[in-house]
């Protein structure tokens, strides 16, 4: 190969790489499995006193009906920003609400002094997991493939992400 052919091959390789990165950015994912949207895990700190919740218990928790884990350990809800797969799953499966209904629910709940604030909005799975690690009592929904060491995945109806019966897909 001549040096001119080497340069052309390098340019073509870079062009292909740029095209792949652009495609990944447009789909919002670098993995076909993530682009399709996989299981969503409920994560807490290891010392949070919960291992397994029924779907109705998760619903009560994220509706703000349960504000303490035990004693004085307050529940801090962390939820992904609109348009994320995790938020879509949570709104459909847990809240059973549309985006406008969700916003109105929390405005009403805070206005009636039934909650001091709504869930905290997080903009990525990594932001959610970092905050769960930093805030005692916090709980979040994240892509099950992105759970870091140091967090515990809560079983839902006795199942974990990846199980065919797992409800948060």
Each model region followed by its residue ranges:
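N-terminal secretory signal peptides that target proteins for export/translocation
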Residues: 1-13
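Extreme N-terminus of proteins, especially the signal/transit-peptide cleavage junction
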Residues: 10-13, 33-38
């Amino acid at each position: 190969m001549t040096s001119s052919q080497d340069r052309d091959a390098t340019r073509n390789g870079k062009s292909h790489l740029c095209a792949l990165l652009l495609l990944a950015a447009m789909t919002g994912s670098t993995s076909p499995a993530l682009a399709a949207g996989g299981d969503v895990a409920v994560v807490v700190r290891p010392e949070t006193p919960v291992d397994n919740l029924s779907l109705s218990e998760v619903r009560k928790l994220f509706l703000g009906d349960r504000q303490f884990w035990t004693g004085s350990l307050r529940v801090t809800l962390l939820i992904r920003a609109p348009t994320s797969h995790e938020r879509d799953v949570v709104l459909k499966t847990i809240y059973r609400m549309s985006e406008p209904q969700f916003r109105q629910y929390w405005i009403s709940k805070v206005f009636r002094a039934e909650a001091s604030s709504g869930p905290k909005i997080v903009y990525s799975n990594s932001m959610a997991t970092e905050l769960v690690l930093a805030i005692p009592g916090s709980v979040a929904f994240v892509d099950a493939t992105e759970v870091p060491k140091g967090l515990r995945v809560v079983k839902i109806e006795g199942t974990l992400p990846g199980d065919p019966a797992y409800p948060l897909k």
